[in-house]
Amino acid sequence: MVPQIDRRTFLKRVGQAGGLVVAGGALESFLAACGGNVSTGGGTTPTPGVTPIGNAGLKTPGLLQWGATSDGGAPYVFPDPSNPNQLVGFEYEIGQAMAKLMGVVSKQIENDYGQMEQALLANKFDMVMNGWEKTPDREKTELFSQAYYRYGQQIVVRADDTRFAGKTNSSDLGLTDLEGLTVGTGASYKAADILGEDKKITTKLYDPDLPFNDLAAHRIDAVLIDGPIVAYYVLGAGPGAKANPALKAIGKPFRTDDYFIGFNKANPNAQILQPEIDQALAVLKKDGTLKTIYMKWSMWNDQQAEIGIM
């Protein structure tokens, strides 16, 4: 019996460095279509030739503190399997890059994902960077940075499910193809809202456990979830990741959305920090840093140009 995977363990395998090849080119096709605290390091020396970006909005001078779940948080931020005292992940690298431009140190602050917004509003850190999505409810209490990654929702089914025979990751599929099925996703995920739009779909939410094991065990019919998570856990994209032969991604990613950095709207410091972070992200988009990070984590695709990443 395969143990259940919680959100953090689940995320631990999604989108790291390139080089893996899935039979039939599935990984390459998919990526082309998609979209206690551990010391985080991060130097304080600004990038040569670049005017340092302001850091007046920080809670603690010299320290850029961002909330995230690292326990099982791959590919976003998680302990390096070969050195658990060191964090890795694409958002970890983005945090370091922003801090370097600002001449400060980046520090991830551990917090449970389900309590992340409450911690942000209690000013436990400067901002949230954890695959954070903009929603109408969050916009009531949060400010948001410009988008730093564009992704789509991905359908996953059992590889031997005859109902989806002939369906590949290049098929044009959507919500209507899930009607009549029980579909799993993570609680508080964007996919949960999307599935809720169609009353002919039975949605099963997972918190803290996540749906891949239940899918493999025939307890649900499909999963709908962020593309980067599927790339890591199902397709095996990234160092240390392993493809799951019992499952397959079908259909092109749809309902594209973006990841943002969130700030507490009621905190006066956030009014200062948000434009500083936006300035840093703008530099990282134009100088190739973000593209380099996403290439390393097998997350680069043409959709990133739509949000200004070069």
Protein language model annotation of sequence segments:
Residues E93-L101, D160-T162, Y189, D258-N301:
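Extended ligand-binding regions for polar small-molecule ligands
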Residues P46-G131, K140:
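Extracytoplasmic small-molecule ligand-binding "clamshell" domains
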Residues G114-Q115, W132-K140, G196-E197, D221-T256:
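A ligand-binding cleft/hinge motif common to bilobed small-molecule-binding domains
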Residues D71-G73, N85-L101, Q154-D207, P211-F212, ...:
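Bilobed "Venus flytrap"/periplasmic-binding protein-like clamshell domains
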Residues R150-Q154, L235-D278, W300-M310:
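Periplasmic-binding protein-like
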Residues M1-K12, Q16-C34:
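N-terminal secretory signal peptides
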Residues V105-L175:
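Acidic, polar ligand-binding/catalytic clefts
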Residues G35-T44:
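Bacterial lipoprotein signal-peptidase II cleavage site
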